[in-house]
Amino acid sequence: MKDFDYIIIGGGCAGLSLAYELEIHQKLENKTLAIIEPRDEYKRDKTWSFWKIIPHNFDDCVKKSWENFSINVPNKTKFLECSNYPYQSIDSGLFYKKVVDRLKQNKNINFFKNIDEINSKNSFIFNSVPQLKKNNNDLWQHFCGVEIETKNIFLMMK
C-alpha cells in the first residue's frame, strides 16, 4: 500500500478541478496526491453549464457562451442581457484532456481505481462524491437537447 499526503475521492469535474488548481498554484511541491476514480479512461461524456460569476481557469474548455437570452411565454417574449455573468457550457472532453494531461506531468500525482490500493490513515482527504439519499425530494437537474444553428432566424419565420 502506498502513502499519500492528499487523496481526492472522485475524479470528476470537482475532484479534477481541485487537483488542477493545487497543481498550477504549486501547492503540491514535495507532496503526493492520489486521485480515486473508477473509470478506465476519460472521454467526453457530458457538458457542464453554469453562470460564470467568478473567473475560472477553464475558458479554453468553454464550448459555448451566452451573454443574452430570452424567456418566452405565449404571446410574449422578454429579452435579457447577462454579459456580467455569461452562461457557459464546458465540454467535458476538452476539460478532461487539459486537466489530466497537466496532472500526469507531475510524478507525485497518481490515479487509482480503488481506495483499497492506498493507505489513507495519514492523508488529508477530499471527498467530492455526492452522498445521495434514497427517496429524497431534492431537485436533480439534467438537460437533454439539440443545438441548431441557422444563418438568420428571420429567414426561418417566413
Residue ranges: model-predicted function:
Residues 4, 29-32, 123-124:
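Nucleotide donor/acceptor-binding cores
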Residues 7, 39, 129-130:
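Anionic group-transfer/hydrolysis microenvironments
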